[in-house]
Amino acid sequence: MTSQDFINECRYRITYKHNDKVDTLKGEDNFIETENVHCVWFNKSLQNYKGLFIILPLDGKYYECTYNGDKKELYIDTYNKESNECIELKEED
């Protein structure tokens, strides 16, 4: 698997995951395309990959994809942003 293959696979899987949860019975129609999924951070170490993804327009979540090259497994974790707090730190002399 190349780096671009990993990113493309993650974008596809996140799109499917998002669209699978859209409730058309409730009148929701916020389906997305893979073009709406953006990689904001990526790393490759040996045969393993990790990437952070968001959906634009923002859905309030970010997705962490991890590929285990030894087991040929892809894991997707979904996170919700709960808060964003500013903490002022005092500088020491």
What annotation goes with each model-predicted range?
Residues M1-D23:
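N-terminal trafficking/processing presequences and adjacent post-cleavage segments
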Residues I14, Y49-K50, I87:
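Amphipathic alpha-helical interaction segments
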Residues V22-H38:
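Intrinsically disordered, low-complexity regulatory segments in eukaryotic proteins
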Residues T34-E73:
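Amphipathic, interaction-prone secondary-structure segments
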Residues K71-D93:
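A short, surface-exposed interaction/processing loop segment used at functional sites
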